[in-house]
Amino acid sequence: MNGLTATGVTVGICAGLWQLVSSHVGLSQGWELLGTIGFVAFCSFYAAGGGKSGFIRSLAVNYSGMVWAFFAALTAGWLASVSGLSAFWASVITTVPFSAVVVWQGRFWLLSFIPGGFLGMTLFFASGMNWTVTLLGFLAGNCVGVISEYGGQKLSEATTKRDGY
């Protein structure tokens, strides 16, 4: 079986297992987005190129996006309190520099998968800035990516004909 087909099989199996596990955990209050965050991280792993470097880059930039989102929220709160702006307008204003930083950090190899930073920001905000569920969701999803890729490689090796047999 070629590598892409084998990886497709293992991705499907891993996605199904992730859905099973995360949907049960997601029944607990505050954990509703665990499945979504994990699936996005799963995609982020492959989009960052897969393998060891894809895992490292994806996870690092997902986490950096969370940190920038946290600082953006703190800055928006501060700006609203000192300026009299509404929280909405303070958030709009602080989105500009913190979004730019996510792009600018891309000059560094570890943070060069720029979309991953925006995924981290977005899902951290979507979770209500829940550090635990977002950190664990990104870690689990990237790990599921590694497992599915490795499984695909092993399945391909086990099912590929060798020496003409």
Swiss-Prot record:
The keyword Transmembrane applies. GO terms for cellular component: plasma membrane. Keywords: Cell membrane, Membrane, Transmembrane, Transmembrane helix. The chain crosses the membrane at residues 30-50, 65-85, 86-106, 108-128, 131-151. It comes from the Bacteria. It is found in: Cell membrane. It is a multi-pass membrane protein. This is Uncharacterized protein YahC. It comes from Escherichia coli (strain K12).
